[in-house]
């Protein structure tokens, strides 16, 4: 099984997962994908304690980065090839999915693009409440374009932390807007402050729900 969910930051980030029927039915051969805001790499958290919490889940955890990650901590883990894309192995059963990659999982293709801005940030909070690396870069966009080209500009699923700018609401990413225009995708899942469907865009905003993709 492959499932997606929203942010799991905070010391109680895994508590709702342990109460979820979908998660409880999973095994270590199944993947739960956190769409940005994974508590394992949350800034100023107890890394060892967080790793234990996530390894105690019944499933394996994949995640993309968002606006709350410690990017210095992420950078300590080297890249490895896996299922068609690049990953960072954080611990056994906990894996970071790099930006702009197209992965093959369970017979489906997944374009992933982490990264999300922090609103109203200033230099005083730099490397404390926000990191420059959290913004999607031109290099990230180019990586996605090259990998999509290799896959015929097609992905069964797109997984992002932010959303395309033209989809309504404050903020949003111009890079993701361009990728949405260029990519022939099935369903787009992205993190947000509430769970809601965006049928006009074949998209789902995910907060607390755990959604099985089969």
How would you label these PLM feature ranges?
Residues 1-20, 117-129:
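Short, charged N-terminal beta->alpha structural module
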Residues 85, 92, 106-168:
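Active-site-proximal loop/helix segment associated with metal-binding centers of metalloenzymes
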Residues 39, 43-51, 149-184:
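Active-site-proximal segments of metal-dependent phosphoesterases and phosphodiesterases across multiple
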Residues 2-4, 31-35, 112, 157-159, ...:
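Structural motif
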Residues 104, 178-183, 193-214:
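Binuclear metal-dependent phosphoesterase catalytic core
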Residues 1-3, 101-112, 157, 199-203, ...:
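Beta-strand-turn-beta hairpins that frame and shape the catalytic cleft
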Residues 8, 162-164, 185-196:
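Histidine-centered catalytic micro-motifs
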Residues 5, 10-104, 181, 206-209:
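Core catalytic region of metal-dependent phosphoesterases/phosphodiesterases
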């Amino acid at each position: 099984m492959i499932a997606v969910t929203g942010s799991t930051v905070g010391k109680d980030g895994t508590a709702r997962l342990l109460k979820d029927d979908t998660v409880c039915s999973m095994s270590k051969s199944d993947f739960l994908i956190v769409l940005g805001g994974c508590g394992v790499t949350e800034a100023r958290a107890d890394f060892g304690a967080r790793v234990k919490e996530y390894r105690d889940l019944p499933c394996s955890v994949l995640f993309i980065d968002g606006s709350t990650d410690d990017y210095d901590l992420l950078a300590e883990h080297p890249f490895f090839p896996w299922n068609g894309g690049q990953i960072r192995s954080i611990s056994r059963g906990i894996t970071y999915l790099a930006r702009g990659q197209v992965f093959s999982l369970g017979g489906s293709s997944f374009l992933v693009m982490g990264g999300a801005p922090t609103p109203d940030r200033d230099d005083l909070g730099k490397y404390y409440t926000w990191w420059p690396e959290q913004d999607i870069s031109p290099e990230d966009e180019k990586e996605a374009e090259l990998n999509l080209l290799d896959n015929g500009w097609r992905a069964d699923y797109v997984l992002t932390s932010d959303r395309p700018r033209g989809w309504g609401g404050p903020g949003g990413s111009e890079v993701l807007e361009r990728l949405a225009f260029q990519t022939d995708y099935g369903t787009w899942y992205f993190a947000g402050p509430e769970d809601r469907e965006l049928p006009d865009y074949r998209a789902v905003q995910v907060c607390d729900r755990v959604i099985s993709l089969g």
